[in-house]
Amino acid sequence: MNDRIIDFDPLIEGVLIKRYKRYLADIALESGEVVTAHCANTGPMKGLLREGAKVRISVSTSPKRKLPFTWEQICVLDEKNEEVWVGINTLFANKLIKKVIEKNLLDEIIGEIETIKSEVPYGKDKKSRIDFFLTPKSSNPDKRNIYIEVKNTTWIRGNVALFPDTVTKRGQKHLIELKELIPESKSVLVLCITRKDACFFAPGDEADPLYGNLFRESLSAGMITIPCSFEFHKDHISWRGIKPLK
């Protein structure tokens, strides 16, 4: 399975010099020029950061941007010592998952969809926002509305993708709120695995034990978990299918 999900202008290749202040990275281009790129992923990026690694960046012509370059991908080695490109722009995850929903690639799990809305307020105080709020088609036997929370996933151990890679209070809160929606609504956690070498998904207990416990509690309560895998290229992203839980 290697379906193209998103196409874009070819990215610029370079080499990582260093990442600093969490949201900045100095990158040496093939021309020899050194540029500073914005890093949307402010987490530890466990298992990814290595000075001298090959990277890919995009460029924006918007005059509103302080930095025209955005760090999009990094190249790492898998278990077989083969190159794997990993998508590290966390802002891209929702765009990818929306494409997957629109292409009906999740229908077998969540049913056929009538409408998709983004960033809809939910929870007891309505102060949280769900990534996607879906309504089912009238022909769908399950009439419950669907709440989808998306998590960008880059960390891997062997062939198991793991989330989170650090303690995430926000992620813990999301699991609690998803659990509270059950059974009146359908709660779905989608893991956007931005690398092709993952065969399974599991919660990152080592990084955040409480998140792992909350994940299993929510799963037992009826939360649906869908680990979606993608392969990243210089000018497009491909769908690699849904991976099982470990």
From Swiss-Prot:
Biological source species: Prochlorococcus marinus (strain MIT 9301)
InterPro entries this protein is in? Answer: SfsA, SfsA_C, SfsA_N
Q: What is this protein called?
A: Sugar fermentation stimulation protein homolog
Give the Pfam families listed for this entry. Answer: SfsA, SfsA_N
Give any GO molecular function from the UniProt entry.
DNA binding
Q: Which family does it belong to?
A: Belongs to the SfsA family.
